[in-house]
Amino acid sequence: PIAGSMVLAAILLKLGGYGIIRMMQALPTTKTDMFLPLIVLALWGATLANLTCLQQTDLKSLIAYSSISHMGLVAAAIIIQTPWGLSGAMTLMIAHGFTSSALFCLANTTYERTHTRILILTRGFHNILPMATTWWLLANLMNIAIPPTLNFTSELLITSTLFNWCPTTIIMLGLSMLITASYSLHMFLSTQMGPTPLNNQTEPTHSREHLLMMLHLTPLVLISMKPELII
């Protein structure tokens, strides 16, 4: 069920980050280098999850692995225990909670009309459902974290924190962001562009689907204009 995927990506996955924040208050600071393996593991996990996204053909699997890769960045930022890292992690959890939930919602919208989640079989929707294509574009751009979205603010804070802690981490972060942009654009182009499948009677999008996307993306845009509400 799509509701389960949306709740899992938006709320339950972020509870792990909240748990790490609460645990860090009782543990020593990172000056002991005790957490170095955990930070490296979190960044490496984020990169591997991104690489896994590149080889996915299933739409829901791709979005799920994307959520996991972002949580790797969140975990690394929290473990460093700096104010900027904590702010960046909190902001990314909120921003990606909205974004991943919106992507799952769009994936279900596509699935209801094509009855498949394979990327190459869901092509050509930009001709049939132009408004849905607009939602796909906005959600993917937010997933890539383009400025001035909240996702960009959070990733900038996390990147600054990790670079200040160890400049070498910029290599893994840069690679991770590059792969994120690659699979997000691949997902958009695969599902929306290309020739429309023949003998495909597609029903139009409903008002409730547009309302649902508005409820996901409007809070993100509003918080992006006033990020001090959560930072």
Curated annotation (Swiss-Prot):
Subcellular localization, as worded in the UniProt entry: Mitochondrion membrane
Pfam families linked: Proton_antipo_M
Record key words, sorted: Electron transport, Membrane, Mitochondrion, NAD, Respiratory chain, Translocase, Transmembrane, Transmembrane helix, Transport, Ubiquinone
Any one Gene Ontology molecular-function term assigned to this protein's record: ubiquinone binding
A single BP term in Gene Ontology: ATP synthesis coupled electron transport
The reaction(s) this protein catalyses: a ubiquinone + NADH + 5 H(+)(in) = a ubiquinol + NAD(+) + 4 H(+)(out)
Chain segments annotated as transmembrane: 1-21, 34-54, 62-84, 89-111, 128-148, 169-189
Superkingdom per UniProt: Eukaryota
EC number in record: 7.1.1.2
Entries under InterPro entries matching the protein: NADH_UbQ_OxRdtase, ND/Mrp_TM
A GO-annotated cellular component: mitochondrial membrane
Annotated membrane topology: Multi-pass membrane protein
Main location (coarse class): mitochondrion
Function: Core subunit of the mitochondrial membrane respiratory chain NADH dehydrogenase (Complex I) that is believed to belong to the minimal assembly required for catalysis. Complex I functions in the transfer of electrons from NADH to the respiratory chain. The immediate electron acceptor for the enzyme is believed to be ubiquinone.
Family indicated by similarity: Belongs to the complex I subunit 4 family.
Protein name: NADH-ubiquinone oxidoreductase chain 4
Gene: MT-ND4
